[in-house]
Amino acid sequence: MRYDLSVEEGLVDFIENKALPDTGVSQDNFWLGLSSLIKEMTPENRKLLRAREELQDKIDKWHVARIGQPHDHEAYKSYLREIGYLVDEGESFLIETENVDPEISSIAGPQLVVPSTNARYALNAANARWGSLYDSLYGTDAMGAFDQAEGYDRGRGARVVARARVFLDNAFPIIGASHADVKRYYVSDKQLLVDDLPLVSPEKFIGYSGNPKAPNSVLLKNNGLFVVLVFDRAHVVGSRDQAGLADVRIESALSAIIDLEDSVACVDGEDKVNAYSTWLGLMKGDLTSEFEKNGKKVVRCLNSDLSFISPSGDDFSIRARALLWIRNVGHLMTTPAVLDSNGDEIFEGLLDAMVTTMLGMHDLKKA
């Protein structure tokens, strides 16, 4: 027992010995908080579910009473207003939320959804912030159907490189030249020069790594999204490129939802611990996954931030991981992992809200 709650032993062990340490939250405060939350919000949750059930019952009866009749849109809309399903639009207002992550407030990009019960999928999603344009073009039908030849197809690879240069010409045009003909990228007088020529929009050059005269990488930005040119003349691609360009990496999945709801089936405390463990590892930054690929052991972990030097010579870093969201279970489901003072299953969403917020404190304390 934890206060007036009956909690599955595995969940207790996870909360007290793995999750709470280093958060600054004591075991007593956590369980007291969960107990208080359940007492306060369970009646509200049930009230909402009753209201939903009543509305659904009225809507069902409307349709049953009109079986075989043509649909009357205006009458149906009027009925939905009458029962309170539809309400009048309110006055316009300004959102006052501050300190919102740019991935939410100002940058547009893809978002992934992955099950919280699969650490490998979660790592893939978190690391999907960056992707190789070369790999994406080569490995899909964007460049046409694959030939049957085994191994690296040089012809296809050449078409990929040419297509990537078209992208660079469109996003980062050079005054009087094309990226397809470039032999050298370097930094001089706080700007990127490409065969001694500047970009049409020099402000799109954000930074570089390595030697400014022969950088390892160049960081560019277009429409709010970063692009990294990777140079490596020892690389299989870079060795055949006159500028030594081995890859073009682009910002891809800006955010990812770690899902506790639709894509998982968590039926007891053991399942919840599995799901919460993934979120804990993501928040602490130490999540790993081991698997075999082509007969070799692979250990996957979270990517580290990317470091660069600004045009003015200052060191800075940018995010290498997607902004992570957590999707808790909604209002309907209950879980046997925790029973209230009456011996009833608690609403799973209340448990999720308490636990995932507490786990998120590991990340907040690192900031």
Residue ranges of predicted features:
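Catalytic alpha/beta active-site cores
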Residues: 77-78, 82-367
